Amino acid sequence: MSAKRRLFTSESVTEGHPDKICDQISDAILDAILEKDPNARVACETSVTTGLVLVSGEITTSTYVDIPRIVRDTVREIGYTRAKYGFDADTCAVLTSIDEQSPDIAMGVDRALEAREGQMTDEEIEAIGAGDQGLMFGFACNETEELMPMPISLAHRLARRLAEVRKTDVLPYLRPDGKTQVTIEYDENGKPVRVDTIVVSAQHHPEITQEQIQRDIKEQVIKPVVPAELLDENTKYFINPTGRFVIGGPQGDAGLTGRKIIVDTYGGYARHGGGAFSGKDPTKVDRSAAYAARYVAKNIVAAGLADKCEVQLAYAIGVARPVSISIDTFGTGKVSEDILIEVVRNNFDLRPAGIIKMLDLRRPIYKQTAAYGHFGRTDIDLPWERTDKAALLKEQALALADK
């Protein structure tokens, strides 16, 4: 590899990874509540270990949901259905400890919340402040069709394929836990040119040989997913490199909601504000503003205004308008970043209630995002992945640049 070339690595995990089990449980509970009470306030945290699920947090709602049933259904759907996995949907204990949202926090967010989003006036949108301070990033680049960095895109596809071959009995000896990692080589112009390294760790039945696992994963998981032109004789494969992965899931490691924030976003390729997504209703800007920032960045790149774009939004608790909007195109912008910020302000309502209205976020759409990434998804329809504002942004930005 020449000195000007570089390597970049991102990882993903399967839905059976302990931390991802927690994310899916938290978002399944959120979806069940939003389905009956779209204005509910939810901050739901989950912890799992051998034979135990603990659900805690702050939930303020007018409805009732059966949390233990939702937990068991989610665990069963993931595939933990046998006691010998060390974690089983039917026999695990489920403990809950739920409080209401602090009135001190609610005070800054509550006003006008009873209004339906479709009928909210600008004054009502202005009255709903951010649920917390914080900074959020959104990113897009033209490395893949879905405008995501290639390392995380391929890592997610491999992780999804691992679950698919398990659930469809193509590789029936696989168990739910698993991880993937992809290293991409970039040329001197920053373009991805080849896959340098692939790492796959897949939980399995104890009687299967490592030779069979390695052969099967290469043929049934890697080859169907990774474009052949990116693989060459120098690509390195590490498949279950410890030699054995029988004990996994919550029996192997305890899990917590919100511990896979880099897997959830851009695989480390872009910056992260630190806030997790799962279990949080859309008044939490940790989630909704990160989605809005991706929406902005993706439309800028889709418009051809930059090859790569990172958007930062920042908020103060109880204040509706973002305290700052920052855009970095890493030298790839076709117009200045000041112009981009101006057209973004003109075309995106980045107040919390404005984001909720713009992206229609008071719906039960979150559990499907809780594994395999919140961004760049081609298998599900997510509002922040639309590029419906690209043409308008391009027209306005080029008009400003000509002035």
From Swiss-Prot:
Q: Which organism is it from?
A: Geobacillus kaustophilus (strain HTA426)
Give the gene name: metK
Q: How does it assemble?
A: Homotetramer; dimer of dimers.
Q: Which InterPro entries match?
A: ADOMET_SYNTHASE_CS, S-AdoMet_synt_C, S-AdoMet_synt_central, S-AdoMet_synt_N, S-AdoMet_synthetase, S-AdoMet_synthetase_sfam
Entry-linked SUPFAM superfamilies: S-adenosylmethionine synthetase
User: What GO terms in the biological process aspect are recorded for it?
Assistant: one-carbon metabolic process; S-adenosylmethionine biosynthetic process
- Cellular localisation: Cytoplasm
Q: Where does K(+) bind?
A: E45
- Please verify whether the record's keywords include Ligase: no
Which residues are L-methionine-binding? E58, Q101, D253, K284
Binding-site residues for ATP, renumbered to this chain:
H17, D177, G178, K179, R244, F245, D253, R259, K260, A276, K280
Q: Which GO terms describe its cellular component?
A: cytoplasm
What PROSITE patterns does its record include? ADOMET_SYNTHASE_1 (PS00376), ADOMET_SYNTHASE_2 (PS00377)
Q: Where is this region: Flexible loop?
A: 101-111
Reaction equations catalysed: L-methionine + ATP + H2O = S-adenosyl-L-methionine + phosphate + diphosphate
Care to name a GO molecular-function term for this sequence? ATP binding
Give the pathway annotation.
Amino-acid biosynthesis; S-adenosyl-L-methionine biosynthesis; S-adenosyl-L-methionine from L-methionine: step 1/1
Name by which UniProt lists this protein: S-adenosylmethionine synthase
Keywords from the UniProt entry: ATP-binding, Cytoplasm, Magnesium, Metal-binding, Nucleotide-binding, One-carbon metabolism, Potassium, Transferase
Identify the domain of life. Bacteria
List cofactor names only.
Mg(2+); K(+)
Q: Could you give the cofactor binding note from the entry?
A: Binds 2 divalent ions per subunit. Binds 1 potassium ion per subunit.
Summarize the protein's role.
Catalyzes the formation of S-adenosylmethionine (AdoMet) from methionine and ATP. The overall synthetic reaction is composed of two sequential steps, AdoMet formation and the subsequent tripolyphosphate hydrolysis which occurs prior to release of AdoMet from the enzyme.
Q: Which family does it belong to?
A: Belongs to the AdoMet synthase family.
